[in-house]
Amino acid sequence: MGFFSIDATDLKWVNGDKDDIEDLCLHGHAIAYIGEHKLEYEDATISATALYLLKTLTEDHIIDTDNQMLPCCGFNIYPHPDDSLDNVIILGCPNGIDWTVLHDGNTVILELDDGTREYIPLDDYKREVFRFADKIEMFYKSCTAKKLPEDDELTCNGYIAFWNEWHRRRNQ
Protein backbone atom coordinates (compact mmCIF):
# COMPACT_ATOMS: atom_id res chain seq x y z
CA MET A 1 0.00 0.00 0.00
CA GLY A 2 1.00 3.62 -0.52
CA PHE A 3 2.05 6.47 1.70
CA PHE A 4 0.37 9.76 2.61
CA SER A 5 1.33 12.36 5.19
CA ILE A 6 0.58 16.02 5.61
CA ASP A 7 1.82 18.68 7.99
CA ALA A 8 1.96 22.43 8.39
CA THR A 9 4.61 24.59 9.97
CA ASP A 10 4.95 28.31 10.58
CA LEU A 11 1.27 28.62 11.50
CA LYS A 12 0.14 32.23 11.50
CA TRP A 13 -2.59 34.65 10.55
CA VAL A 14 -2.44 36.59 7.30
CA ASN A 15 -0.70 39.57 8.97
CA GLY A 16 2.12 37.23 10.06
CA ASP A 17 1.23 37.27 13.75
CA LYS A 18 0.79 34.18 15.92
CA ASP A 19 -2.54 35.54 17.16
CA ASP A 20 -5.11 37.79 15.52
CA ILE A 21 -8.55 38.15 17.03
CA GLU A 22 -10.21 39.16 13.73
CA ASP A 23 -8.51 36.88 11.17
CA LEU A 24 -10.64 33.77 10.64
CA CYS A 25 -8.35 31.83 8.25
CA LEU A 26 -5.14 30.19 9.40
CA HIS A 27 -2.11 30.19 7.08
CA GLY A 28 1.14 28.28 7.11
CA HIS A 29 3.71 26.24 5.24
CA ALA A 30 1.97 23.06 4.00
CA ILE A 31 3.88 19.91 3.10
CA ALA A 32 2.17 16.78 1.83
CA TYR A 33 3.81 13.53 0.82
CA ILE A 34 1.93 11.31 -1.59
CA GLY A 35 4.12 8.29 -2.10
CA GLU A 36 7.57 9.66 -2.90
CA HIS A 37 6.20 12.97 -4.18
CA LYS A 38 6.60 16.02 -1.96
CA LEU A 39 3.99 18.74 -2.46
CA GLU A 40 4.82 22.00 -0.74
CA TYR A 41 3.04 25.34 -0.58
CA GLU A 42 4.71 28.03 1.48
CA ASP A 43 1.68 30.16 2.37
CA ALA A 44 -1.38 27.92 2.15
CA THR A 45 -4.70 28.55 3.86
CA ILE A 46 -4.22 25.70 6.32
CA SER A 47 -7.67 25.93 7.89
CA ALA A 48 -9.26 25.32 4.48
CA THR A 49 -6.84 22.45 3.79
CA ALA A 50 -7.89 20.71 7.00
CA LEU A 51 -11.59 21.03 6.22
CA TYR A 52 -11.08 19.87 2.62
CA LEU A 53 -9.21 16.82 3.92
CA LEU A 54 -12.02 16.06 6.37
CA LYS A 55 -14.46 16.22 3.45
CA THR A 56 -12.38 13.66 1.54
CA LEU A 57 -13.00 11.07 4.24
CA THR A 58 -16.46 10.53 2.73
CA GLU A 59 -16.43 12.42 -0.58
CA ASP A 60 -14.34 12.17 -3.73
CA HIS A 61 -12.39 15.24 -4.81
CA ILE A 62 -11.42 15.63 -8.46
CA ILE A 63 -8.35 17.71 -9.25
CA ASP A 64 -9.03 21.18 -10.67
CA THR A 65 -12.83 20.95 -10.30
CA ASP A 66 -13.14 22.68 -6.93
CA ASN A 67 -10.84 24.36 -4.46
CA GLN A 68 -7.28 23.08 -4.25
CA MET A 69 -6.28 20.74 -1.42
CA LEU A 70 -3.49 23.19 -0.54
CA PRO A 71 -5.18 26.49 -1.42
CA CYS A 72 -3.49 29.86 -1.55
CA CYS A 73 -6.59 31.68 -0.40
CA GLY A 74 -9.79 31.15 1.46
CA PHE A 75 -10.75 34.78 1.71
CA ASN A 76 -14.52 34.28 1.65
CA ILE A 77 -16.38 31.81 3.84
CA TYR A 78 -20.11 31.56 3.43
CA PRO A 79 -22.71 29.22 4.84
CA HIS A 80 -23.99 26.83 2.19
CA PRO A 81 -27.32 28.25 0.96
CA ASP A 82 -29.06 24.86 1.17
CA ASP A 83 -28.56 24.20 4.88
CA SER A 84 -28.83 25.86 8.23
CA LEU A 85 -25.19 26.55 9.07
CA ASP A 86 -24.21 22.88 8.59
CA ASN A 87 -21.83 23.34 5.65
CA VAL A 88 -19.56 26.07 4.40
CA ILE A 89 -18.43 27.32 1.01
CA ILE A 90 -14.88 28.66 0.93
CA LEU A 91 -13.92 30.83 -2.03
CA GLY A 92 -10.37 31.70 -2.93
CA CYS A 93 -8.10 32.36 -5.87
CA PRO A 94 -7.06 29.75 -8.47
CA ASN A 95 -3.57 29.33 -6.99
CA GLY A 96 -2.55 26.32 -4.93
CA ILE A 97 -1.70 22.65 -5.21
CA ASP A 98 -4.29 20.01 -5.92
CA TRP A 99 -4.71 16.26 -6.29
CA THR A 100 -7.58 13.83 -6.78
CA VAL A 101 -9.02 11.78 -3.91
CA LEU A 102 -11.13 8.74 -4.83
CA HIS A 103 -12.69 5.98 -2.73
CA ASP A 104 -12.72 2.29 -3.61
CA GLY A 105 -14.16 0.33 -0.69
CA ASN A 106 -11.67 0.56 2.18
CA THR A 107 -9.01 2.17 0.01
CA VAL A 108 -8.39 5.84 -0.77
CA ILE A 109 -6.73 6.55 -4.10
CA LEU A 110 -4.66 9.74 -4.31
CA GLU A 111 -3.86 10.79 -7.87
CA LEU A 112 -1.47 13.56 -8.88
CA ASP A 113 -1.75 15.67 -12.01
CA ASP A 114 0.92 13.52 -13.71
CA GLY A 115 -1.23 10.40 -13.25
CA THR A 116 0.78 8.97 -10.34
CA ARG A 117 -1.51 7.03 -7.99
CA GLU A 118 -1.08 6.00 -4.37
CA TYR A 119 -3.43 3.52 -2.72
CA ILE A 120 -3.90 4.21 0.99
CA PRO A 121 -5.92 2.07 3.42
CA LEU A 122 -8.91 4.18 4.48
CA ASP A 123 -8.09 3.73 8.19
CA ASP A 124 -4.52 5.01 7.65
CA TYR A 125 -5.76 7.95 5.60
CA LYS A 126 -8.38 8.80 8.22
CA ARG A 127 -5.79 8.70 11.03
CA GLU A 128 -3.50 11.10 9.14
CA VAL A 129 -6.33 13.49 8.27
CA PHE A 130 -7.55 13.50 11.89
CA ARG A 131 -4.00 14.09 13.19
CA PHE A 132 -3.60 17.07 10.87
CA ALA A 133 -7.08 18.52 11.58
CA ASP A 134 -6.58 18.12 15.33
CA LYS A 135 -3.26 19.99 15.13
CA ILE A 136 -4.94 22.88 13.32
CA GLU A 137 -7.86 23.01 15.74
CA MET A 138 -5.43 23.04 18.69
CA PHE A 139 -3.72 26.08 17.18
CA TYR A 140 -7.08 27.88 16.96
CA LYS A 141 -7.80 26.94 20.58
CA SER A 142 -4.41 28.29 21.68
CA CYS A 143 -5.29 31.72 20.28
CA THR A 144 -7.63 34.39 21.55
CA ALA A 145 -11.28 33.65 20.73
CA LYS A 146 -12.24 35.18 17.41
CA LYS A 147 -14.18 38.43 17.26
CA LEU A 148 -16.74 37.85 14.53
CA PRO A 149 -17.66 40.82 12.34
CA GLU A 150 -20.83 42.45 13.66
CA ASP A 151 -21.53 44.19 10.36
CA ASP A 152 -21.09 41.12 8.12
CA GLU A 153 -23.69 38.46 8.90
CA LEU A 154 -22.67 36.35 5.90
CA THR A 155 -19.05 36.00 7.04
CA CYS A 156 -20.12 35.53 10.66
CA ASN A 157 -22.47 32.71 9.67
CA GLY A 158 -19.82 31.30 7.34
CA TYR A 159 -17.39 30.98 10.24
CA ILE A 160 -20.02 29.29 12.39
CA ALA A 161 -20.86 26.93 9.50
CA PHE A 162 -17.12 26.22 9.03
CA TRP A 163 -16.76 24.89 12.56
CA ASN A 164 -20.11 23.11 12.48
CA GLU A 165 -19.06 21.23 9.36
CA TRP A 166 -15.56 20.61 10.75
CA HIS A 167 -16.84 19.07 13.98
CA ARG A 168 -19.50 17.00 12.23
CA ARG A 169 -16.95 15.55 9.83
CA ARG A 170 -14.29 15.09 12.51
CA ASN A 171 -16.71 13.19 14.75
CA GLN A 172 -18.32 10.93 12.14
What annotation goes with each model-predicted range?
Residues 1-84, 93-95, 99, 103:
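N-terminal low-complexity, intrinsically disordered segments
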Residues 20, 41, 87-89, 113, ...:
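Short, flexible coil/linker segments at or flanking structured domains
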Residues 62-85, 91, 138-162:
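Short glycine-rich, low-complexity/disordered patches
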Residues 104-172:
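Mixed-charge, glycine-accented linear interaction segment located at domain edges/termini
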